[in-house]
Amino acid sequence: MAIIKPFKGIRPPQNLVEQVASRPYDVLNSEEARAEAEGNEKSLYHIIKLEIDFPVGMDEHDERVYAKAAENFQLFQDKGWLVQDNKENYYIYAQTMNGKTQYGLVVGAYVPDYMNGIIKKHELTRRDKEEDRMKHVRVNNANIEPVFFAYPDNEKLDVIIKKYTANKPVYDFIAPGDGFGHTFWIVDQDADIATITAEFAKMPALYIADGHHRSAAAALVGAEKAKQNPNHRGDEEYNYFMAVCFPANQLTIIDYNRVVKDLNGLTPEQFLAALDKNFIVEEKGADIYKPSGLHNFSLYLGGKWYSLTAKAGTYNDNDPIGVLDVTISSHLILDEVLGIKDLRSDKRIDFVGGIRGLGELKKRVDSGEMKVALALYPVSMKQLMDIADTGNIMPPKTTWFEPKLRSGLVIHKLD
């Protein structure tokens, strides 16, 4: 069973939400954050991308940066840019992209559920990134940014969400830059709060869609606080961390593509000939070619697009990891032909989220920056959940979710 609870969210007043809300800390660099926050002292970047308040070149992991985050978080509250609700609520957060809306419940997720595997992971985390987020949680004593969860479809929750979203929202705005819609309601009726809690308690698992490092950091800090408290009871606020939970049937995973700097000493002809061992290779010409389904790949090289279809026998349908296109391409193209052994550390490879389109792959190859691009058919939510359920881990850079959660709509304090 998944344990969740409502919480007293800290939120911007309605008239300030568009100034406060920001993109997540990990989808933009310091230079981009400086540009987006320019002239806006209320931007959440002054809490989550603190290096922008220091001279250019300041190490974002400097202790002074973390201290400034806590100082600014308090300042935002003192100035009334962030105000705590006086009652424990759940919240509904809807995102609209390209005319499609997905509705998430904002809840306090239970730290022990993360530790004992009820909250399921599909990615490995890096300790240095965990520690960075842990410092941020510690100094602020809060989850400033939420994690993105998926839950099994649930009709009773659908009914409650429909009831609230028929009413006027607390926030409703279009984010600058991406044009995505962000809408927000408060679930404040006790009977509905009780039903939501009870329905989650029936769920065997929740699934991290995006935010593995934030989840790990929040859970580890919660466990730290429990250990440090001689009177720990288990119901303290630090036992919970903020998550936005979406029904799995509303989520779409976007392709996550690869670009590589060189052909590992091969000529284009030798490279294509090497691919012929495991793939049916078809030239598609100058027009962009998109993968048509599982085990079909799109390759861009020398101004031409190619279709690659994995030959029978090159993968195992009964292996939940081996059957993934990201695994097939990693083993049979990136490793076997291009000599790229470690996707995490090899400097010859870069990754491009599908939201940028296949034109971005063409652009990076045509510019001479990269030599070849590889586009993959996206994994499904079912594949993700099956892999998490079996305790397996997806290869690096497998999933890309869009739209990203907007930060700053609500914050969860740990006391």
Segment roles from a protein language model:
Residues M1-D415:
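Surface-exposed, charge/polar-rich loops and edge strands
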